[in-house]
Amino acid sequence: MSLINKEVSEFSVQAFQDNAFKTVTKADILGKWSVDFTFVCPTELEDLAEKYEDFKSIGCEIYSVSCDSHFVHKAWHDASKTIQKIKYPMLADPTGALARDFDVMIESEGMAERGSFIVNPEGRIVAYEVIAGNVGRNADELFRRVQASQFVASHDDQVCPAKWRPGAETLKPSLDLVGLL
């Protein structure tokens, strides 16, 4: 079953950000572009941390989510120089409720698959990627995908081709285009 256009369910979770605990709810993600990043490894978190200001500059917030507690996130932050670079919220999902809602929970292991989800300002999933646990994700491609999602949201008569970047040509689906690509 596809998650595209699925509305994110109501939630309230504890998070660790800026050396403090806070609560994050569905209301916090509405009105901006959000990227939810489940089951993470340090290299991916660092990649996102290095690109965090770029995401913020296009009105996007990053949330990393794991099935650990917010206390585990703080302990990890305190022990790892890599994790100390993170400025975005690290959401705790110890019950797996968010992982189940995003359909990435591995029940037999009590953990989530690696997934990246782009949620529009209305709270609907517009793009996602779920990959094997032994393959890392790329923040540059995720950033490009957010930009493309933002573009087509405001240009509903156009689509962004592979490798599209802001300012590049888009396509306007039509009968005249069929068979020409």
Residues covered by each model-derived region:
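Chalcogenol-based redox active-site neighborhoods
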Residues: 1-181
